[in-house]
Amino acid sequence: MHNARPLIIKSYLRSLPRHINGNEKIDALTYFAEGAAKCGDSASVTNSQTYETCDVGAIIGNAFDANPSKVRLPHYQVRKMVMDTQHSLHRYWLSIDSNVFIYKNAANPHKYLRYSFNGVFPATGIYCNETPGTENWNNMRRDYNMDLKPWRSSGNHILICLQRPLGWSMRGVDLMKWLKRTLSRIRENSDRPILIRWHPGDWKAFPNYKSTLVKFGVTVSPQNRHITEDLVNCWAVVCHNSTPSAVAPIEGIPAFITDEPAYSQGGDIANTDLSQIENPHMPDREQWIRKLAQCHWSFEDVRSGRCWSHMRNWVKVS
């Protein structure tokens, strides 16, 4: 052990909505506690809606959303309570979040999820991946039957991937104003066809923005179309900071982001200057993909304690 005493770990089941599909998120919290206990720490699952003293409080997701309809929800309040209390005590909260690689297999049979301390952006979270090994990436290559595709040598259209209009990940940037600025910047430097990909989890909001998109004179990818279809014959992908900034380079397509690189999972290798849309940088990706895989863990990794044995090295308590 790297600390003088066993750590106290709490997995907060009430960080989940009351009605959820399936048991994956419940299992994620439960297995995390099981794995930590196997490493010799005092770890347990709690159904409490009030704070329980701990060195590490595990939750699903985060509580960064400013949407008034969400901040009143009980599970959101539990998440915020854990995050705020741990922060005030200079302790740790652990986020169990979405899998960047899930586009490879939506069923996610090995239940890979992303684990980090104290934040979900690379800039704010501790991903425990500064010096990544090869084991996680090798496991994911095997389990997803995948590898890094060679950088593309040709392409036609530019794919712009939109984020949720009111999503916290936009970090306060208005989506339609962002799109207008981004389209203008691209058009200053390229006359390639532009395809817009709406956020797949937010099609209910699409009708509210459809007329604006029509005015921009762009083509919108159909609902339920897989991102790999939109990447066929693609020249480059553009987004603010979201998951496609990582998906595109895995598939051999250069990505451009408009946010600070440290707020994007693809930031280490992404382009940031849209004036270079016709001449994108395509760097070596090996270290980047190892870092990305290092913060993804399967249920087998989590339940066995392999995940916690690794992450525990970043927990410093007195």
Regions found by a protein language model. Name each.
Residues M1-G61, G167, W314-S318:
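N-terminal pre-catalytic "stem/leader" segment of glycosyltransferase-like enzymes
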Residues C39-A107:
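Extended catalytic core of nucleotide-activated donor transferases of GT-like folds
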Residues T182-Q223:
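Catalytic donor nucleotide-activated moiety binding site of glycosyltransferases and closely related
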Residues N23-F32, V71-M81, D174-R185:
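Well-ordered, non-membrane alpha-helical segments in soluble/globular domains
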Residues N108-G155, G267-S318:
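Leloir-type glycosyltransferase catalytic cores
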Residues I8-S15, I60-A63, I96-V100, G155-G167, ...:
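Short loop/turn segments at strand-loop or loop-helix junctions that form parts
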Residues N224-A270:
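A donor-sugar binding/catalytic signature common to diverse glycosyltransferases
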